[in-house]
């Protein structure tokens, strides 16, 4: 999609997931 907001949202989600993964380690 070319929706900037959606892109931002996905970026945010990815970041969040990385943090979650770090917590699980």
UniProtKB/Swiss-Prot annotation:
Expressed in seed. Signal peptide: none annotated. The keyword RNA-binding does not apply. Glycosylated. Residues 1-25 are annotated as: Disordered. Keywords: Glycoprotein. It comes from the Eukaryota. Exhibits hypoglycemic activity in RIN-5F cells (in vitro) and in diabetic mice (in vivo). No hemagglutinating activity on rabbit erythrocytes and does not increase IgG and IgE immunoglobulins in rabbit plasma. This is Insulin mimetic protein. It comes from Cnidoscolus quercifolius.
